[in-house]
Amino acid sequence: MGLVWSLISNSIQTIIADFAISVIDAALFFLMLLALAVVTVFLFWLIVAIGRSLVARCSRGARYRPV
């Protein structure tokens, strides 16, 4: 009976460990997607800010330049 109970206990522990690993894996995947989204938004904001400053600088230069 001890051997059977040991096998059952081992299988239960394996199932629980696999489930925990799956949950942790899913959480890490979600966090990775979240970090990727944040980095993408930050890069988009940075590119837009640089573009706006360049456009403002060019238009300011054209305003003071006589044609």
Curated annotation (Swiss-Prot):
Residue ranges crossing the lipid bilayer per the database entry: 28-48
UniProt topological domain (Intravirion) ranges: 49-67
Regions of this protein lying in the Virion surface compartment: 2-27
GO CC annotation terms, alphabetical: extracellular region; host cell endoplasmic reticulum membrane; host cell Golgi membrane; membrane; viral envelope; virion membrane
Effect of G2A: Absence of myristoylation. Decreased infectivity
GO biological process annotation, one example: monoatomic ion transmembrane transport
Top-level taxon in the UniProt lineage: Viruses
Record's comment on post-translational modification: Myristoylated.
Endoplasmic reticulum retention signal: annotated segments: 2-15
Molecular function in Gene Ontology: channel activity
Keywords on record: Glycoprotein, Host endoplasmic reticulum, Host Golgi apparatus, Host membrane, Ion channel, Ion transport, Lipoprotein, Membrane, Myristate, Secreted, Transmembrane, Transmembrane helix, Transport, Viral envelope protein, Viral ion channel, Virion
Membrane topology note: Single-pass type I membrane protein
Lipid modification (N-myristoyl glycine), residues: G2
Keyword Nucleus listed: no
Subcellular locations according to the entry: Virion membrane; Host endoplasmic reticulum membrane; Host Golgi apparatus membrane; Secreted
Known partners and oligomeric status: Homomultimer. Associates with itself into higher-order structures, including dimers, trimers and tetramers. Associates with the GP2b-GP3-GP4 complex.
Family listed: Belongs to the arteriviridae E protein family.
Function: Minor envelope protein. May function as a viroporin in the virion envelope that facilitates uncoating of the virus in order to release the genomic RNA into the cytoplasm for subsequent replication.
Protein's name according to its UniProt entry: Envelope small membrane protein
